[in-house]
Amino acid sequence: MKLPKEGDFITIQSYKHDGSLHRTWRDTMVLKTTENALIGVNDHTLVTESDGRRWVTREPAIVYFHKKYWFNIIAMIRDNGVSYYCNLASPYMMDTEALKYIDYDLDVKVFADGEKRLLDVDEYEIHKKEMQYSADMDFILKENVKILVDWINHEKGPFSKAYITIWYKRYLELKNR
């Protein structure tokens, strides 16, 4: 499949382990694609939940997906600084319909002041039993929490101020064409 190009708009679909559609984002603007990663931006993007509820994102957010890591990263650009919402999730795949991944419940939130929180541990434990996550899957996800926290602590990739500056600036250039 041909990779989307800078400035293209794509749909993002999040699924659960049992194959059910969890959430859809319409019209994410692509900023960069490589063989293994995609960087995009959501800005007033329509989001549809599995129960049909719809809402629109409030602020620009740079999104980062990778084919080798079991997480994706959303950097929300707010007046008080950048905060992050990180989903523990399968590496993404693309088809002609959308960028797709499986959401594995665990999330790491990083507030603009640097505080970190691991979220939805109870939901993860419930779904682990209900959807029968394997021991290998559990290990992979927990190891990727460690990798993610290391990235946060060392300001790697999307957690670097320079990264946010570069990609937000590029988004503004593309948006104003």
UniProtKB/Swiss-Prot annotation:
InterPro entries: DUF402, FomD-like_sf, Ntdp-like, SA1684. One of its GO terms (molecular function) is magnesium ion binding. Its cofactor is Mg(2+). It is an enzyme of class 3 (hydrolase). Has nucleoside phosphatase activity towards nucleoside triphosphates and nucleoside diphosphates. It catalyses: a ribonucleoside 5'-triphosphate + H2O = a ribonucleoside 5'-diphosphate + phosphate + H(+); a ribonucleoside 5'-diphosphate + H2O = a ribonucleoside 5'-phosphate + phosphate + H(+). It comes from Streptococcus pyogenes serotype M1. Pfam families: DUF402. It comes from the Bacteria. Mg(2+) 2 binds at D105, D107, D120, E123. Its EC number is 3.6.1.15, 3.6.1.6. The active site is at R23 (proton donor). This is Nucleoside triphosphate/diphosphate phosphatase. Belongs to the Ntdp family. Gene3D superfamilies: FomD-like (2.40.380.10). Keywords: Hydrolase, Magnesium, Metal-binding. Mg(2+) 1 binds at N87, D103, D107.
